[in-house]
Amino acid sequence: GYQHFFGPMAGGVDYFSHCNASGQHDLWLGEQQHRESGYLTDLISRKAIDFVKASLAANQPFFLSLHYTAPHWPWEAREDAALSDSVKDNLFHLDGGSIETYRRMIHHMDEGIGALVDCIDRLGAAQDTLIVFSSDNGGERYSDNWPHVGGKMDLSEGGIRVPWIVRWTGQVPAASLSAQTCITMDFSASFLDAAGVKAHPDFPLDGQSLLEVFRHPAHQFERPLFWRMKHRNQAAHRKGTWKYLKIDHHEYLFDLEHDPRERANLRDRHPDQFQSMKAAWQAWDATMPEIPDGASVSLGYGLESMPAR
């Protein structure tokens, strides 16, 4: 586990009261509840900067896993403290928010990331620090995942294709682009490789190192990817530009190079490719633990709250 922790345990909390959807205070420093006034995004940014400063002052190598709750609901920017009491019983905030509020929430996060990067540069650690920015899923509510269809809780591209930005001064060519397909589990393999550390033999990694891609963005290797989700009985497999997708009882085959919006179902035009992709997903799924029958899915909102995406 981590040596230090600061933040909430729940996925979303009020940005000012720091209470979760059950109304319980949910801000922790290590394993102890912590109370500190302030906008949560700013508090997380300051703690991250303090950690980096202390590590560099002690000449101690560090790994910082920085997870903002922004721009997760409730829809509160830095200037919206007055909203805190009114949303305490409805953190999903289904009747609130706006594109402008969403923009400001992202801007506050961006300010914190910028301050952290400035700190690393100012302390002369840029060439020794690999920085990765990404997201756990596509956006929901006020975000726009164009040109992709869908969002959070979907295995269509709008739900799973997210930014992946890397900075490592002297190692990653500035302003370069890569077409390499990758997935979150590749983080750990890449970080260990960059640090020159082997994974523990008792805990083999599922991910693959992207270090060669970092240094040579034109380099690519085949990286089959698999997903499954209880919500709507979804399944997906990507290999190269091909993608197999199942939603409810409907199955699709897409060529993402020519159809990133997943509008042209090619399963009947390319039946062999479709069956191969489906069989590969089934073989992978057979190696995974079964999803318990009692596992539940709660979106927090539905068609009664807003139209479908």
Predicted regions and their residues:
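Formylglycine-dependent
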Residues: 1-61, 68-77, 88-94, 100
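Polar, surface-exposed loop/tail segments
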Residues: 127, 167, 174-235
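Beta-strand elements within well-structured catalytic alpha/beta cores of enzymes
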Residues: 62-67, 106, 113, 130-135, ...
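Histidine-centered active-site microenvironments of extracellular/periplasmic hydrolases
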Residues: 1, 73-79, 83-86, 111, ...
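Active-site rim elements
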Residues: 32-39, 96-103, 151, 171-182, ...
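Long, internal low-complexity/basic segments
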Residues: 187, 239, 248-250, 256-309
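Loop/turn elements at helix/coil->beta-strand transitions in domains of secreted/extracellular proteins
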Residues: 1-3, 58-64, 125-131, 221-223, ...
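Short, solvent-exposed turn/loop segments enriched in Gly/Ser/Thr/Pro and often Arg
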Residues: 8-12, 65-74, 133-141, 206-207, ...
